[in-house]
Design a protein with these regions (language model features):
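Active-site-lining helix/loop region of Rossmann-like oxidoreductase modules
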Residues: 5, 133-175
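Rossmann-fold NAD(P) dinucleotide-binding segment
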Residues: 71-89
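N-terminal Rossmann-like NAD(P) cofactor-binding module of classical short-chain dehydrogenase/reductase
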Residues: 62-68, 86-87
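Rossmann-fold NAD(P)-binding glycine/threonine-rich loop
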Residues: 90-113
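Short acidic low-complexity segments
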Residues: 48-59
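N-terminal Rossmann-fold NAD(P) dinucleotide-binding loop
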Residues: 11-12
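Aromatic pocket-lining residues of Rossmann-like dinucleotide-binding sites
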Residues: 18-19, 79
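NAD(P)-binding Rossmann-fold cofactor-contacting core
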Residues: 24-40
Length: 175
């Protein structure tokens, strides 16, 4: 069983992707019950594995995808302490830092914690890493994305543009 916390544009895309490839039950929780109900009823007609859940119902999942706006660290800690693996799509620098600090907790509980599983960080880093193998050396990588996930993603993008960025350079994080 997989839980998805957040039924906005990003959470919807996560659920739509999961129902195509998996036949496991998917529990959808969103603080806005109307949003969760809309997603479950739209996908539930074709894929009977999608249902609306209370937050506490997600405790029955083996993995929870945190697809709502940040912060995710507190919610992730709750699930990890219940031996539930977590995938976070947060791209907020302080939230990602707090999530990464949960690594030893996740290991101690025998679960997986995936941080930054969105476009950037996430896919952009995986693509850069994969493509860098084709070159002798890579000095810089610039990523351009088209579109946005939704209103919460747009707000986070604007906050990110007005602040400091974090980069990985020669084996260490720099600001």
């Amino acid at each position: 069983m997989i839980g998805v916390f957040g039924a906005g544009i990003v959470g919807t895309k996560v659920v739509e992707t999961l129902v195509v490839d998996l036949q496991t039950e998917i529990l959808v929780h969103d603080p806005n019950k109307t949003t969760a109900n809309r997603l479950a009823s739209r996908l539930g007609e074709k894929h009977r594995v999608v249902s609306v859940a209370r937050k506490s119902d997600l405790n029955a999942a083996s993995i929870v995808v945190l697809a709502g706006p940040p912060p995710h660290a507190t919610i992730a800690r709750e699930f990890i302490e219940k031996n539930i693996s977590v995938v976070s799509v947060s791209d907020d620098v302080s939230d990602c830092t707090n999530l990464l600090a949960l690594d030893s907790l996740a290991k101690n509980h025998g679960v997986t914690l995936v941080v930054g599983a969105a476009s950037s960080p996430g896919m952009s880093g995986l693509l850069a890493r994969s493509m860098s193998k084709s070159f002798d050396a890579v000095d810089e990588v610039h990523i351009a994305l088209h579109g946005t996930g939704g209103p919460a993603c747009a707000r986070q993008h604007h906050r990110a543009l007005s602040g400091q960025s974090v980069g990985w350079h020669e084996g260490e994080w720099i600001r």
